[in-house]
A protein has these predicted regions:
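N-terminal beta1-alpha1-beta2 submodule of the flavodoxin-like/Rossmannoid cofactor-binding fold
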Residues: 1-116, 173-176, 180-195
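Short beta-strands and strand-loop turn motifs
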Residues: 17-18, 94, 132-135, 166-167
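Sparse recognition of residues in long alpha-helices and their boundaries
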Residues: 43, 122-125, 171
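Short beta-strand elements in bilobed, periplasmic/extracellular small-molecule ligand-binding domains
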Residues: 44-49, 160-168
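Short, well-ordered helical secondary-structure segments
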Residues: 59, 112, 120, 145, ...
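Intrinsically disordered, low-complexity segments used for protein-protein interactions
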Residues: 64, 127, 168-171
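Short, glycine-/small-residue-rich phosphate/pyrophosphate-handling segment
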Residues: 104-105, 119-164
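A short, flexible beta-alpha/helix-coil linker loop
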Residues: 136-139, 169-173
Length: 195
């Protein structure tokens, strides 16, 4: 599902991407709270729930096409997302931690960013803000280190500003909604995106 609030040309565009397969879970709750903070601060927001889309994994067959067009030629639900990524000023990626990395839904989405590898397209991401929101079940706070490292390196490669991250231990579905401190932190991250 893709949902948005329309805004004027001067507004910051914030794209929220939910990579959890679970509806109404901790990832979705936190990304929505970041987006609420961004909207209340005057940003236009758009929200994508990846599990509702049909996005195929990279097939490594269209490398030249990707490098010359800045998007992939696989005909699936990723196609309209390229323009949304290009048009955003900030991207909020939400994913639970699965095996020390992102969910399959988010990984496939990010793998299709190969289309941005050519400098002509990568430069369009220079200065865009990237935020990671990641709830995880493990009580070991080092659990998301590899996920953070992956996204930090990706942001560096594309000259994006890895501006914030929210890493939260949350064992049961929806638990974060009762954690006022975490919800405030998520809201504040969204509100700060305009700065």
């Amino acid at each position: 599902m893709i949902a948005s609030t329309s805004g004027d040309m001067c507004q910051m565009n914030v794209l929220g991407v939910i990579g959890s397969p679970r509806k109404n879970g901790n990832t979705e709750i936190l990304v929505d709270e970041v987006l609420r903070g961004a909207k209340d601060a005057g940003s236009a927001i758009e929200r994508i729930f990846l599990n509702e889309l049909k996005i195929k994994p990279c097939q490594a067959t269209c490398i030249q096409y990707c490098k010359t067009h800045g998007k992939c030629n696989i005909p699936d639900d990723m196609s309209p997302l390229y323009d949304k990524l290009y048009d955003s000023d900030a991207i909020v990626l939400g994913t639970p931690v699965y095996w020390w990395g992102p969910s399959a839904q988010l990984k496939v989405f990010i793998d299709r960013w190969y289309a941005f590898c050519h400098p002509a397209f990568a430069k369009k991401f220079k200065g865009k803000k990237l935020v990671l929101v990641s709830p995880f079940e493990d009580s070991d706070i080092t659990t998301p280190e590899h996920l953070v490292g992956m996204l930090k390196r990706s942001a560096e490669y594309m000259k994006m500003d890895f501006s914030d991250k929210l890493l939260v231990t949350a064992k049961e579905k929806g638990a974060v909604a009762r954690d006022t401190k975490t919800m405030k932190e998520a809201y504040d991250i969204g509100a700060r995106l305009k700065n």
